[in-house]
């Protein structure tokens, strides 16, 4: 497979060139809340709150403070156009956003400049980053279902996590329900997402994710399902992890 100039992949990388191409096509619409990334805009407030609260519990911060993440270094892997990077920067975190799509990073930088925000955006992969870099918080939100080797990917994530650091992962479970809702429903019936956005075979079950994390000396301390209510038109946390779910993991002592 040949690589376009809009994407990056190196030998040993877990990046899938086809996955990069999918999201590169959406780069111009990332910040349109009514565009093709509308589902991400709808779920984003819940993701932000979940991550913020987990970080504040871990690092003993007041979640109500406007600068509750001040002094903490955060890495957002697969950051897209910065939908998580910008609000966490506002909360005081020193954010590094990485994405293998050049057009996504260009869109992220442009939007940050318009908002007069200083965010360290890089068109790169976790494998290409300086292994000496360290972060208090590492995010892999809706990423593991798009990589070629989940275990190797999480190993690189764990390597840049500071001792006592926190990792947050969100992904999709793999079962008949997730196929019906996340593939058939979201991509073909409701058309929330472009067809082919996800491959059901790449979805990761909670048990699989737990094992991948443990193999890299990361233990899950919190987990929650994420469900959508069509009547309220909003996402909420739930004990139901059949489709979307998030986990918080810490290094084993």
Swiss-Prot record:
Which GO biological-process labels does this protein carry? methylation
Q: Report which reactions are catalysed by this protein.
A: a 3-demethylubiquinol + S-adenosyl-L-methionine = a ubiquinol + S-adenosyl-L-homocysteine + H(+); a 3-(all-trans-polyprenyl)benzene-1,2-diol + S-adenosyl-L-methionine = a 2-methoxy-6-(all-trans-polyprenyl)phenol + S-adenosyl-L-homocysteine + H(+)
The record's listing under InterPro entries reads:
SAM-dependent_MTases_sf, UbiG_MeTrfase
Which keywords accompany this UniProt record?
A: Methyltransferase, S-adenosyl-L-methionine, Transferase, Ubiquinone biosynthesis
Return the CDD domains for the record: AdoMet_MTases
Q: Which residues does the record give as S-adenosyl-L-methionine binding sites?
A: 47, 78, 99, 141
Q: What is its EC number?
A: 2.1.1.222, 2.1.1.64
Q: Which Pfam families match?
A: Methyltransf_23
The answer to whether keyword Transcription regulation applies is no
Protein name per its UniProtKB record: Ubiquinone biosynthesis O-methyltransferase
Organism encoding this protein: Bradyrhizobium sp. (strain ORS 278)
Q: Corresponding gene? A: ubiG
């Amino acid at each position: 497979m040949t690589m376009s100039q809009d994407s990056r992949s190196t030998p040993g990388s877990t990046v899938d060139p086809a996955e990069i191409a999918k999201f590169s096509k959406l780069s111009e619409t990332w910040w349109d809340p009514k565009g093709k990334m509308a589902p991400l805009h709808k779920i984003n407030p819940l993701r932000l709150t979940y991550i913020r609260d987990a970080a504040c519990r871990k690092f003993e911060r007041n979640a109500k403070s406007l600068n509750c993440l001040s002094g903490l270094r955060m890495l957002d892997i697969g950051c897209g156009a910065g939908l998580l990077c910008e609000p966490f920067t506002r909360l005081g975190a020193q954010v590094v956003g990485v994405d293998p799509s050049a057009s996504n990073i260009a869109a992220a930088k442009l939007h940050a400049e318009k908002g007069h925000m200083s965010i360290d955006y890089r068109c790169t992969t976790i494998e290409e980053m300086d292994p000496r870099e360290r972060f208090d918080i590492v995010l892999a939100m809706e990423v593991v279902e798009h990589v070629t080797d989940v275990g190797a990917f999480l190993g690189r994530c764990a390597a840049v996590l500071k001792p006592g650091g926190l990792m947050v992962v969100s992904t999709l479970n793999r079962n008949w329900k997730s196929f019906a809702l996340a593939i058939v429903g979201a991509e073909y019936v409701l058309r929330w997402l472009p067809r082919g956005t996800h491959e059901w075979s790449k979805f990761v079950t909670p048990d699989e994710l737990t094992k991948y994390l443990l193999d890299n000396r990361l233990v899950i301390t919190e987990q929650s399902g994420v469900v959508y209510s069509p009547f309220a038109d909003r996402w909420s946390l739930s004990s139901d992890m059949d489709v979307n779910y998030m986990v918080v993991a810490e290094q084993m002592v």
